From Swiss-Prot:
Listed InterPro entries: LCN-type_CS_alpha_beta_dom, Scorpion_toxin-like, Scorpion_toxin-like_sf, Scorpion_toxinL/defensin
Disulphide bonds in the chain: 16-37, 22-42, 26-44, 38-64
UniProt-recorded name of the protein: Beta-toxin Isom1
Organism per entry: Isometrus vittatus (Bark scorpion)
Domain notes: Has the structural arrangement of an alpha-helix connected to antiparallel beta-sheets by disulfide bonds (CS-alpha/beta).
Length: 70
């Protein structure tokens, strides 16, 4: 399993302001374990390995991974 910004068929990650929106989006639409709003896009945790995710910098990934843990 992996973490990241899950993308839809048009290659876009859902934009957000609220974390509960992302949790629903990540769990119900992308079947992840959970999700939250990180830097204005929905960041999902526990995505299946074959899910497409947005290419992001390591710095941004570390930031989003770190924020949910703490």
């Amino acid at each position: 399993k992996k973490n990241g910004y899950a993308v839809d068929s048009s290659g876009k990650a859902p934009e957000c302001l609220l974390s509960n929106y992302c949790n629903n989006e990540c769990t119900k639409v992308h079947y992840a374990d959970k999700g939250y709003c990180c830097l204005l896009s929905c960041y999902c945790f526990g995505l299946s390995d074959d899910k497409k995710v947005l290419e992001i910098s390591d710095t941004r990934k570390k930031y989003c991974d770190y924020t949910i843990i703490n």
